[in-house]
Swiss-Prot record:
NCBIfam families associated with the record: PRK04940.1
Pfam annotation, one family: UPF0227
Organism: Shewanella baltica (strain OS195)
Domain of life: Bacteria
Family: Belongs to the UPF0227 family.
Designated name of the protein: UPF0227 protein Sbal195_2522
Gene3D superfamilies reported in the protein's UniProt record: alpha/beta hydrolase (3.40.50.1820)
Length: 179
């Protein structure tokens, strides 16, 4: 089973396409949608929804996959549920870069402060990251340097921020899920 968490643009048609591509790894791909506008509510909703979905699966190794803001949540919700996660062009600092886009971006900082201290050290090797060299939204070199001590980093020379084509990375994602 793969949980797919969309980015800030929840209605993008690319979400369906990415889910279809992920079905080459596992036919059971589930969209876990969230508002993107209310971080504290989103966190509670995502925790409950993932726990509920896991009860209805016999997969011994479910995987979280998130793009952009979805990767922010995939890392945290995956950690809290003991799941591996794939972070694609993760938005690591929504408290800074979501100003003007959501009502209370400061809630992300509050979530970070209330999360398990040094959770990345406790989550080492349980996530892999895929970054676009040509990401038009974030400085992925900087973000990769924040995560490289904890997770493996793969680079893509072609895809933009929303990462519409996962095909080149599906074998690595599958191997990571099954390892």
């Amino acid at each position: 089973m793969i949980f797919y968490l969309h980015g800030f643009d929840a209605t993008s048609p690319g979400n369906h396409e990415k889910m279809r591509q992920l079905q080459f790894i596992d036919p059971d791909v589930r969209l876990v949608s969230y508002s993107t506008l209310h971080p504290k509510h989103d966190m509670q909703h995502l925790l409950k929804e993932v726990a509920k979905q896991m009860k209805h699966s016999d997969d011994p190794a479910p995987l979280m996959v998130g793009v952009g803001l979805g990767a922010y949540w995939a890392e945290r919700i995956g950690f809290l549920n003991g799941l591996k996660s794939v972070l694609i062009n993760p938005n690591l600092h929504p408290e800074d870069n979501m100003q003007g886009k959501i009502d209370r971006p400061e809630e992300y900082a509050d979530i970070a402060n209330k999360c398990v201290s040094q959770f990345r050290e406790k989550n080492t090797h349980k996530a892999m990251c895929i970054f676009s060299v040509n990401d038009e939204m974030f400085d992925n070199q900087q973000l990769a340097s924040e995560l490289s001590a904890y997770y493996s980093i793969d680079w893509d020379d072609v895809q933009p921020h929303k990462f519409p084509q996962l095909a080149a990375h599906l074998p690595k994602i599958k191997a990571f899920k099954l390892a």
